[in-house]
Amino acid sequence: MGTQPMTDRLNRPFRDLRISVTDRCNFRCHYCMPADIFGPDYPFLKKTEILSFEETNRLVHLFHQTSPIKKIRITGGEPLMRKDVDQLISMLTATTGIEDVAMTTNGTLLPKMADKLKKAGLKRVTVSLDSLEDEQFGKINGRGIGTKPVLDGMEAAKEAGLGVKVNMVVQKGVNDQDVLPMAQFFKEKGYTLRFIEYMDVGNSNGWRMDDVVAKRDILEMIHKVHPLEPVDPEYPGEVATRYRYKGTSVEIGVISSVTDAFCTTCNRARLSVEGKLYTCLFATKGHDFRELLRSGASDEEIQQKLAAIWHVRDDKYSLKRTSLTNKRKKVEMSHIGG
């Protein structure tokens, strides 16, 4: 394994890898998988089209040998809908030695999976919850599901020994009134809550700039009631700007891809469930590694392809975002993870 990470054209290292393990989800959140598009007849991927755990593990092992990966995040869709996903986590931690393996989930399946995930080597979960109001949350998730299954999932993860963070996508006129109640609730719980600016990911969510609640407005709302102080990032390229409630150890974070983009330090790649590598969340196309795997490519050929892709990477979509760039066809977030 090389001791130094590869860098791209903007001198950004390849440090983090997000792995989507399914394109399916039991929610239909309108900003990700709206029900009118992802309905009963939607053509989800067939089993033969998605990477097996063995194929995924081989790719990650080779990627890690090419450029040391510091963190893996398992995503979806809803990753816990992939049968035996804990087995993949066991394989990844055993084969690569990468210790920082996390998962983003809606939390509803954690009560029956948390112990297995912990034993497999998962370190923490980030659970998505956009409101504490059952009716409002049910509208957002498109399934009428209240908050209890998600909150129960968080508790199950905590009891299993997993770290827990919470993500909230904030949309003007939808759930911006919930910013303060969420902040208060999770401050008392002691969980880090991260507010995410509503982003133009994919092509299905009808994104408009007018629907974005800016980082500065989120912080102002909270700081007036719960004074905050800045916290230094844990590592270069950390996506969330971190703050701590004064007089406590409890933190919040803001992920501000729209109003305060972090493209210049982005060190992440995304491996989709069918084996395409994307070098940006807002990418229009991916690089096919499944075909390489299934055509008998050697380890060296796979590593060479990864290096060639990363060395010419120059993505900086969020720094160039306009009403015109928003119209270009992008891969859906449910396909490559957030």
From Swiss-Prot:
Enzyme Commission number: 4.1.99.22
Nucleotide-binding in keyword set: yes
Pathway: Cofactor biosynthesis; molybdopterin biosynthesis
UniProt signal peptide: none
CDD domains recorded: Radical_SAM, Twitch_MoaA
Single GO BP term: Mo-molybdopterin cofactor biosynthetic process
Binding site for [4Fe-4S] cluster 1: 25, 29, 32
Binding site for [4Fe-4S] cluster 2: 263, 266, 280
Claim: Cell division is one of the keywords in the record: no
Stored PROSITE patterns: MOAA_NIFB_PQQE (PS01305), RADICAL_SAM (PS51918)
Keywords, sorted A to Z: 4Fe-4S, GTP-binding, Iron, Iron-sulfur, Lyase, Metal-binding, Molybdenum cofactor biosynthesis, Nucleotide-binding, S-adenosyl-L-methionine
Co-factor binding comment: Binds 2 [4Fe-4S] clusters. Binds 1 [4Fe-4S] cluster coordinated with 3 cysteines and an exchangeable S-adenosyl-L-methionine and 1 [4Fe-4S] cluster coordinated with 3 cysteines and the GTP-derived substrate.
Function: Catalyzes the cyclization of GTP to (8S)-3',8-cyclo-7,8-dihydroguanosine 5'-triphosphate.
Protein name: GTP 3',8-cyclase
Gene for this chain: moaA
